[in-house]
Amino acid sequence: MKRIGFLTILSLIFFANTSFYKATYSKSSYYIVIDKSDYELSVYDAAGWLISYPIVFGNDDQGDKLFEGDRKTPEGTFTIIGKKIHNKWCRYMGLDFPTAADTEKFNMRKQQHIIPAYAKIGGGIGIHGTWPHEDYAVDQYQNWTMGCISLKNEHVKQLFDMMPVGTRVTIKR
């Protein structure tokens, strides 16, 4: 009987201190700034700069993403909305592209005939590593992605472990 009482109390303590709410977004003090012109991803917290990593993109043209398939990296402020270990690119942190602001820019460019009428906005933009054993692509500034941001695999592992879902990411030229 004492054992049942002990297990009951232990269970109550466990469940009272357990949250079954899975947070979708973190109130992270970290934020990331990606500078396309410097090929650099920098991590900051409330106290300031923490670390920077070399990066590459999709296209040598550093302009803002216009439409799906242009291989350009979008500019603006985004949020990390998901993280996963990736079989091709080591780690992947998905961004919330396109945002409402991106959709507005896209529609305006379509109306102004800057982009083709049949163009789509695209999506699936994220931060990830390189193909296995191809970190040299970052060292040689080989822009190879479809618009994502690519780091060396050792660097993307560090970033993946440090950044929670909900981290703000600013991409600028």
Language model segments and positions:
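Bacterial Sec-dependent signal peptides at the C-terminal "C-region" and cleavage site
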Residues: 2, 12-26
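Sec-dependent signal peptide hydrophobic core
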Residues: 5-9
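N-terminal post-signal-peptidase region of extra-cytosolic proteins
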Residues: 21-30, 57-82, 108-113, 153-158
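A structural motif detector for short, solvent-exposed N-terminal "entry" segments of globular domains
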Residues: 23-61
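Well-ordered beta-strand positions in beta-sheet-rich domains
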Residues: 31, 52-54, 77, 124, ...
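Histidine- and/or cysteine-centered catalytic micro-motif in compact active-site loops
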Residues: 37, 46, 55-58, 83-85, ...
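Short, solvent-exposed loop/turn elements at domain surfaces
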Residues: 41-44, 51-52, 62-65, 88-91, ...
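Exported/periplasmic cell-wall-interacting domains
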Residues: 84-173
